[in-house]
Amino acid sequence: MLATIDPIALRLGPISIHWYAICIVSGLLLAVYLAQRLAPEKGINPEHILDFILLAFPIAIVGARLYYVIFQWSYYSQNPSEIFAIWNGGIAIYGGLIAGAAVLYWFAKRHAIAVLDFLDIAAPGVMIAQSIGRWGNFVNQEAYGKAVSQLNYLPEIIRQQMFIDGSYRVPTFLYESLWNLVGFSIILGLRYFNKGLRQGDVTSFYLIWYGLGRFVIEGMRTDSLMFVGLRVSQWVSISIIILGAVLLYFRKQRQKADYKMKN
């Protein structure tokens, strides 16, 4: 049996660099690279992407942490010093998405960029960043599912890391990481093979795909707050699925109306 992975990847004197941070930053850098490559297609200056990230990233981290702390308040109210210990894990993706989306809306309006265009070029990078970021949960042994008798279908390193509190745990981090990776691949395929993609289509796909996957996977987890029979994140998932479907519907209706006007 292998030992569990040390959450600290590198120690430089008093400075500790955590795997969690490496996963988040790696995903962020890849997302920025992709968005900058896609920006010219929408007539957006690639320099705006970096300006946006420098503003949005810290706010998104605060939003993600705040969301997590609010829904784990029973613990943090008794351990207030832990509220800022983000290196130990404990950030909620939905909190980061909500905060990041708010900043994106403000930034797009300020720089006269169509919000849906900005979202369309951001969505692929966000999805692959989420896929990479889930491996930070793996190292920290968090965001896992119920206890199971064995995980023989997985590599030894994953099985050992998912042996928590005397039991193997369902590796929900892995399921979500793979789900997001598949979603990212589909977006690339749609962009390559379907030249008829309209404004907002990629954003709609992202919202529906991510929401569906998160709804199912969240139901496997054991560490989420319940509300009216479902986990809070499942309610948020339902909301973004509906948002994605409504956006797709109205974009298609507008497309039909435009076609009729031209003919």
From Swiss-Prot:
Topological relation to the membrane, as annotated: Multi-pass membrane protein
Pathway it acts in?
Answer: Protein modification; lipoprotein biosynthesis (diacylglyceryl transfer)
EC numbers for this chain: 2.5.1.145
* Membrane-spanning parts: 15-35, 52-72, 83-103, 112-132, 170-190, 200-220, 227-247
Taken from the UniProt entry, a GO cellular component term is:
plasma membrane
Q: Which GO terms of type biological process are on file?
A: lipoprotein biosynthetic process
Recall the GO molecular function terms of this protein's record.
Answer: phosphatidylglycerol-prolipoprotein diacylglyceryl transferase activity
UniProt keywords (A-Z) are: Cell membrane, Membrane, Transferase, Transmembrane, Transmembrane helix
Name of the protein: Phosphatidylglycerol--prolipoprotein diacylglyceryl transferase
- What is the scientific name of the source organism? Streptococcus thermophilus (strain ATCC BAA-491 / LMD-9)
